[in-house]
Amino acid sequence: MKDKTILTAESVTAGHPDKLCDTIADTVLDCCLEHDPNARVACEVLATAGKFVVAGEISALTIPDISSIVRDTVRRAGYNCRDFDVEVLIHPQSPDIADAVADSGQAGAGDQGIMYGYACSETENLLPLPVVLAHRLTALLTCARTMGRISGLRPDGKAQVSVEYVFGAPRRISAIVLSCQHAEDKDLSQLREELLEFVIQPALRIFPADEDTEIFINPSGRFVLGGIEADTGLTGRKLMVDTYGGLAPHGGGALSGKDGTKVDRSGAYMARCIAKNIVAAGLAEKCTVALAYAIGRAAPVAVDVDTHLTGTYSDKLLEQAVRCFFDLTPAGMIHTLQLNQPIFADACNYGHFTRANLPWEQTGQAGKFAELCAQLDHGDGGG
């Protein structure tokens, strides 16, 4: 381990074009699940100047009014623009894939893939500190706009936080970058003062900056033209924002717009749930869990646990306990994590793993999991 390193994570507001597309896709999914808990949805969204395209596969009892969903979501994100077209290119799920995932009891995975989950003891919600701080900045930036604390803010915005680690522990914040769209007549010096007071200082209460922390606010200067009027958005383009800020591995599969039979989503959520419970149980200071699946197969083809030399037990024993304790089939993950409920649009902004009330963030089973590990350790004569 290096004596000193700098780790960085970023976040975006709900009005960022890519994240707006994610929200639309997950709202479509939620609307399908409201009427049909067994709906199969794979929804992609493209946003560009004057047009939204919603494409993908949906097999459900009721297909929602997708054009209305797009317009309502754009409005809720804070945009006033109404003059845009919505093109809907939706068709049913492939019958081959439908057959592979049809049996509700032993439903196979909807695709192959490897998903990673991560947790560490750095913060209250067991996420890396740069990730937590970046999301706090963008959430407070949006709050400052919607609550009227800062006038002239617009929906688009981004934040980035760099934290200096010494021997693996966070020591200080080395740099903060905050970019926010604003009205043309907004005074930039006033904007900086307001952002420091209402966004940056409150966001850093859990881990304050020091006098040497570099703070960059709109470092490119004016940021008047932004959002969907200036940039093209697409679902699945903010994978590191959604997960661990690039501080943990990622298998490459996006989360939003996919029902629970897609292991890109259910597997990623379950891997996070497992890693979080391992750390919450005091069995490791940090933990990475990997799950790999084959299309049409219910059980994972690989399960891996890595506690980065911080584990109470061997990684092999923890892997054995994971296989015994958690139902890792798609049907099991859907049931355990309540993935047939319309909960996704609320989860897709400011990180999928930042809200303690979400099913995959629960740690109520940590104690029982620790008991199982102790039993396995006693039975095999030691970890």
Please annotate each region the language model reported.
Residues 48, 286, 293-383:
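Internal helix-turn-beta structural module
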Residues 42-61, 295-299:
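Short, charge-patterned binding micro-sites
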Residues 1-40, 376:
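N-terminal, positively charged regions that mediate nucleic acid binding
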Residues 8, 50, 68, 75, ...:
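Glycine-rich, mobile lid/loop segments that gate access to catalytic sites or pores
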Residues 39-43, 157-163, 213-217, 283-294:
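A short glycine-rich, hydrophobically flanked beta-strand micro-motif that places a catalytic Asp/Glu
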Residues 10-12, 16-21, 107-123, 224-248, ...:
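Conserved phosphate/anionic-ligand binding catalytic regions in large, soluble enzymes, centered on
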